[in-house]
Each structure stands twice: as C-alpha cells, then as structure tokens.
UniProtKB/Swiss-Prot annotation:
UniProt-annotated stretches for the region Interaction with mouse UBE2I: 428-433
Gene source species: Xenotropic MuLV-related virus (isolate VP35)
Coiled coil: 436-476
Record PTM Phosphoserine, positions in chain: 190
GO biological process, one term: viral budding via host ESCRT complex
Residue numbers marked as site, Cleavage: 129-130, 213-214, 476-477
Protein name per its UniProtKB record: Gag polyprotein
GO MF annotations in UniProt: RNA binding; zinc ion binding
SMART domains, A to Z: ZnF_C2HC (SM00343)
Motif (PTAP/PSAP motif): 109-112
Modification comment: RNA-binding phosphoprotein p12 is phosphorylated on serine residues.
Zinc finger (CCHC-type): 500-517
Stored Pfam families: Gag_MA, Gag_p12, Gag_p30, zf-CCHC
Comp. bias intervals (Basic and acidic residues): 449-464, 484-517
Length: 536
C-alpha cells in the first residue's frame, strides 16, 4: 500500500481541534477554509520562502508575520489571527508538531562570562521589537552575537539595533545589575525604564505567550513588557473614525491591537481612554460585564463572578504567571464582546433599506456596506445561513436599477445563493457602457425620436390633404349634377294622368275633388316662407 506524505498543513488539518484551542488561547478565531487558503495561496506569494505545504520554521514565520503586520495599505489585517496561531504552534509546539520542528542549533561561542552573584540576573539583551529611545546608540560598539536561528527575525525598519553580547567583566557591571534587579522586584518600572531594559522573569514551562508586544518573549526566553507609545495612540485616534460614527471600524482596530499586542489591564484602560469618550467607555464596560459567564456557562449577574472575570478596579494579575495571563486572555475576550455589543444600534430596518448601490459602486462593495448595516442596525448576523434569503432580497431590491431588473428576471431565482447573485451582478456591472457610449446612445435615441416625430407629422399632413380632397370632390360633383339637370330642362314634368285617374291618390275611378282620401274642412292659412337677407 502507498504511503501518504504528511506536511505541516495537512498535520494542522488532522489536529484542527488543537489548532482552534491554541488560537483561542491567543484570543483569536480561525476558520479551516481560510487557513488553507492563506497557507497554500497567499503566503507563498510574499516571496519569503514560505512553501505551499506550510512550515514550522520560526524564521520564515516571522518574515511572513512582518508582511502581515505591515502598516498602511500593504498590510493584511485579516490574516493576523492565522499567522499568530502558526507562530504559537512553532514557538511552543504540541506533541504532534515537535517531530516537524527542526532542533535549534547550539549558540555561537562568546567571551567567557564570570559567574554572577546570588542575587544577580543574567545579562539583559536588547529587545527584538522597536524601542522608541535612542540611548543605546551612544554606547560603544561591542562584538555582535547572532540571534538564535529558531527565534524571530529582526525588523530592519525599526530604530533599535540588533542585540549585542554583554561581557560583565567588571565588578561594577555586576553591582549595577544587582541594583537593577532589586529595583524591579520592589516596584514596577516606569514606561521609560521598561523600554530600556524591560521587566524580565523566566516564563513557566507550559507558557504559550504570544510573541507580540507589550507582552513579548525575547530571544533569550525572558518575558519583556513594552507599553504603548504615545505616537501609536495618537495615530490610532486620528486616523480612525470615532466609535459613535463607525463602531465596526474602531472595533476591528481594537481587536487587532488586542491580538497583536496582548495588552495588560492597564494598557487596555489606556487604549479605551484614548480611543473612546467617557460615555462610550462606560457603555462598553457595561456590555462587557453582561457577557461574563458563570460556572454553568450561562451569563451571570453575580457581582463576585463579574468582578473576578472583568474587574473595574486594577487587579493584582501577574502577567509573568500562567494564571495571570489566563485572566488577561479572558479579560480581553470580554472587552471585545463589550465593544461588539455596545456598537450595535437599536433595530432600525429603515436604515438598512436606505443603503442603496451607488452609480459607480461595485456589487461587492455594496454588499459589504449592506452587511455592515445589518450588523449595526439589526440583531441579525448577515453571515448566518438562516439570514441569507433576507440579505439576498435586500441585495436585489437595493441594487442599481439596471442590475436589480436583470437580477429579478433570472431563471430559478429561488435556488440562487447570495454568491451566485453577486457574480451575476458583477457580470452586469462590468458590461455597463462607458460614459462616451452612453452619450452616443442618448444622441442616437434623440435623433431617432426626432425622425419618428417628423414622419408622424408628415403622415398626418397627408391624411389631412386626402380628406380635404375628398370633401372638395363631393362638393364639385354636387355642383356638376345640378348644372346638368338645369341644362336638361329645368324641373321634371309631372307624369300624365288618365281620364278617370285621381291626381291626389293616383287611383282610378274618381277625380281629385271627389277623392275620399283627401282631407275635408276649411283650408288653413298657408305658412309664409321667410327669406334670408344679406344682413342675416
């Protein structure tokens, strides 16, 4: 019997349940169909060495991730959950992935390091993600140590230089490190101190922490914290509409930030305070509290359970522990649910019916606007198969008039899916005439209309002349007949009577004076005939 070849892509599909569980731990949701599409069709086109069958090489994954997270129109925010899940699979592989992960090569030899004191921490290394300060550049150059090939690649567009090997050859260096370690244990560092050196503790063995900042696992296996920069917050606020104006777009932005940055409780409050108004923030927090579920899996209103899952006051969650990270994952999920629920407006079907296709708008873009209106103004999910009929009817009736008429005349319309209707609408849209063709058609129609009007006027004129000619012919015929009778002798003579024939009843045997049919009695006055004068 033949053997089937197992690839990273086929392996993930065989263990799809584990993949979804790992994605859930990253606060994201992945679909099998898009998983296959991105792996086999999208990411190979980035030209970074990604094979169509997938790979668990962290170097290649990091390069794909940098393309996905690219800011501006060149980024791919819809692929963020999928590449983050791929990275989690490769960084902390489950048992069924470990045979496919190449072993990490031993680190390159470095200068001898003196044994640290009992309270000293290992020498720190620069972060692989950008720090917004340039104080490191003032240090003298040191021998460069290449990062582990299994770790993520460095973004060459950032301001931070690659990590340098630190040689603690002096006792003063050790004293400084001990003092820094003591300070980090006593009180949490300020954002600037966090940027310069981070707050680093060894992670748990079963940790699945994402590699995105503010919480990020460094190349040396130490957890680093990078707070939001003021420039990021400023750009997010000024380059996106407000929550009241377009809740869907701002919710998508915050969801992307929650996925990629893995923010702490304080970071979430800073993010909400920057992007939302006070009233919007209170509404989001209220809806998030309603989404908390109890031990039975149902929504709960118990204050202790709500405060434990979604606290309004600063909790004592330690993100360096597994328990603390689990609390943060649940908090971010509830916060996202609150954003989605608070962004829904009261049901208003009139708003949905008011969404019509623009003159030059493509059917696909119109469908996206229509679905967004369903999400915003109705409690229905347009992606739900049960709502496909309603969305299809709205798509037909609210399309452009020329497209809507042709869609209504399609054969077997009831069996058409929404995708079929969109494809037909795209065909109709692409066959539309250009403005020049439309002007030419209108000009021809006007000329044809004028030609028809002239022909109709000429036809009516000919009919009028024909009718006038017939009347004149009848009149002339009457005159001619009268003249002919006058020439033949004037009035016609009365027929001659027999000797015994009555002139009144034309019967024989009596005369007119004795005719029994002739009325008797006095003769009445003869009516006078009135003559018309020229004045009348």
């Amino acid at each position: 019997m033949g053997q089937t070849v197992t690839t990273p892509l086929s392996l993930t599909l065989q263990h799809w349940g584990d993949v979804q569980r790992i994605a859930s731990n990253q606060s994201v949701d992945v679909k099998k169909r898009r998983w296959v599409t991105f792996c086999s069709a999208e990411w190979p086109t980035f030209n970074v060495g990604w094979p169509q069958d997938g790979t668990f090489n962290l170097g290649v994954i990091s390069q794909v991730k940098s393309r996905v997270f690219c800011p501006g129109p060149h980024g791919h925010p819809d692929q963020v959950p999928y590449i983050v899940t791929w990275e989690a699979l490769a960084y902390d592989p489950p048992p069924w992935v470990k045979p496919f992960v190449s072993p990490k090569p031993p680190p390159l030899p470095t200068a001898p390091v003196l044994p640290p004191g009992p309270s000293a921490q290992p020498p720190s290394r620069s972060a692989l993600y950008p720090a917004l300060t340039l104080s490191i550049k003032s240090k003298p150059p040191k021998p460069q140590v290449l990062p582990d090939s299994g770790g993520p690649l460095i973004d060459l567009l950032t301001e931070d230089p690659p990590p340098y090997g630190v040689q603690p050859s002096s006792s003063a260096r050790e004293n400084n490190e001990e003092e820094a370690a003591t300070t980090s244990e006593v009180s949490p560092p300020s954002p600037m101190v966090s940027r310069l050196r981070g707050r680093r503790d060894p992670p748990a063995a079963d940790s699945t922490t994402s590699q995105a900042f503010p919480l990020r696992m460094g190349g040396d296996g130490q957890l680093q914290y990078w707070p939001f920069s003021s420039s990021d917050l400023y750009n997010w606020k000024n380059n996106n509409p407000s929550f009241s104006e377009d809740p869907g777009k701002l919710t998508a932005l915050i969801e992307s930030v929650l996925i990629t940055h893995q923010p702490t409780w304080d970071d979430c409050q800073q993010l909400l305070g920057t992007l939302l108004t006070g009233e919007e923030k209170q509404r989001v927090l209220l809806e998030a509290g309603k989404a908390v579920r109890g031990n039975d899996g149902r929504p709960t209103q118990l204050p202790n359970e709500v405060n434990a899952a979604f606290p309004l006051e600063r909790p004592d969650w330690d993100y360096t522990t597994t328990e603390g990270r689990n609390h943060l994952v649940l908090y971010r999920q509830l916060l996202l649910a609150g954003l989605q629920n608070a962004g829904r407006s009261p049901t208003n079907l009139a708003k949905v019916k008011g969404i019509t296709q623009g003159p030059n708008e493509s059917p696909s873009a119109f469908l996206e606007r229509l679905k967004e209106a369903y999400r915003r103004y109705t409690p229905y999910d347009p992606e739900d198969p049960g709502q496909e009929t309603n969305v299809s009817m709205s798509f037909i009736w609210q399309s452009a008039p020329d497209i809507g008429r042709k869609l209504e005349r399609l054969e077997d319309l009831k069996s058409k899916t929404l995708g079929d209707l969109v494809r037909e609408a795209e065909k109709i849209f692409n066959k539309r005439e250009t403005p020049e063709e439309r002007e030419e058609r209108i000009r021809r129609e006007i000329e044809e209309k004028e030609e028809r009007r002239r022909a109709e006027d000429e036809q009516r004129e000919r009919e009028r002349d024909r009718r006038r000619h017939r009347e004149m012919s009848k009149l002339l015929a009457t005159v001619v007949i009268g003249q002919r009778q006058d020439r033949q002798g004037g009035e016609r003579r009365r027929p001659q009577l027999d000797k015994d024939q009555c002139a009144y009843c034309k019967e024989k045997g009596h005369w007119a004076k004795d005719c029994p049919k002739k009325p008797r009695g006095p003769r009445g006055p003869r009516p006078q005939t009135s003559l018309l004068t020229l004045g009348d």
